[in-house]
């Protein structure tokens, strides 16, 4: 039973990958819109976009790490049954 709970926890931790994909899409969309509105700030906007990508990918890299920790490193303590 506890093994199943660990699998559910690891699966829930990887949902953050979907959130990271949405975040990267938002960063790219905002970058394109800002360059379209003000082309003279394209270099500055590109720098901010790269920073946004890096921060979003940092969150995305934590998700598989947490899933690995939940599924294989955290030990299961079996409860002793009375009787």
Curated annotation (Swiss-Prot):
**Domain of life the protein comes from:** Eukaryota
Q: What is its main location?
A: mitochondrion
Ordered alphabetically, the record's keywords are: ATP-binding, CF(0), Hydrogen ion transport, Ion transport, Lipid-binding, Membrane, Mitochondrion, Nucleotide-binding, Transmembrane, Transmembrane helix, Transport
Q: What are the site positions for Reversibly protonated during proton transport?
A: 57
Where in the cell is the protein located? Mitochondrion membrane
Gene Ontology MF term list = ATP binding; lipid binding; proton transmembrane transporter activity
Per the similarity annotation, which family is this? Belongs to the ATPase C chain family.
* Quaternary context: F-type ATPases have 2 components, CF(1) - the catalytic core - and CF(0) - the membrane proton channel. CF(1) has five subunits: alpha(3), beta(3), gamma(1), delta(1), epsilon(1). CF(0) has three main subunits: a, b and c.
Q: How does it sit in the membrane?
A: Multi-pass membrane protein
> Which GO cellular component terms, listed alphabetically, does the Swiss-Prot or TrEMBL entry include?
mitochondrial membrane; proton-transporting ATP synthase complex; proton-transporting two-sector ATPase complex, proton-transporting domain
Please describe what this protein does: This protein is one of the chains of the nonenzymatic membrane component (F0) of mitochondrial ATPase.
Coiled-coil spans are none
Q: What is this protein called?
A: ATP synthase subunit 9, mitochondrial
- UniProt xrefs under CDD domains: ATP-synt_Fo_c_ATP5G3
Q: What is the lineage of its organism?
A: Eukaryota, Viridiplantae, Streptophyta, Embryophyta, Tracheophyta
From the record, give the transmembrane residue ranges. 8-28, 45-72
Keyword ATP-binding: yes or no? yes
Give the matching InterPro entries. Answer: ATP_synth_F0_csu, ATP_synth_F0_csu_DDCD_BS, ATP_synth_F0_csu_sf, ATPase_proteolipid_c-like_dom, F/V-ATP_Csub_sf
Q: Name one GO biological process term.
A: proton motive force-driven ATP synthesis
